[in-house]
Amino acid sequence: MGYTSLIMRLTSFTDYTLRTLLHLGSNPGRLVTIQEIADMHNISKNHLMKVVHELGRNGVIETIRGRNGGFRLAHKPEDINIGAVVRQSESDFYMAECFDPGGNPCGLVKACALKGVLSNATKAYLAELDRHTLASLLPEPAPRDGAVPITFHRKESQAA
């Protein structure tokens, strides 16, 4: 049986969180606006306001208010761990209803090994995310074609 899609799926909130961080990482030091990201990624400004608020609350970005305000990364991209960001933005990692203590109890829970398998899969998924930083997800800067270093030489004055 072939599997063509992942079962583990991030919420839209986490997807937008990661897109926001990738956008900020691609624009180092520059203040970015919610409108800019909303237009670039076709995301609702209202959703992005929640994302930006949460990223600011978690100390991942810094926000500057005012007419010329915006937001930028609060840390270097290599210091932002993707696993940590996903854990902060996802409400839970329940793979099945039996994982949720408040969910519908399953009659098979005492004899079922599926919960252990899914738990291990979730741990492996998060471990993979932990291996990456924002820097590792950013594209390499494009080489500037034809760029040649310029060296300036000063003429020495002629001594008599």
Briefly describe each language-model feature range:
Residues G2-S5, I82, D100-A160:
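C-terminal regulatory/oligomerization modules of transcriptional regulators
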Residues L24, V51-G56:
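Basic amphipathic alpha-helical segments that dock to polyanions
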Residues G25-G29, H75-K76:
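Short helix-capping/hinge SLiMs at alpha-helix to coil transitions
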Residues Q35-H41:
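A short alpha-helical element within helix-turn-helix/winged-helix DNA-binding domains
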Residues D39, G56-R57:
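Alpha-helical residues within the helix-turn-helix
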Residues N46:
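Key DNA-contact positions within bacterial/archaeal DNA-binding proteins
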Residues G59-L73:
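Beta-hairpin "wing" of winged helix-turn-helix
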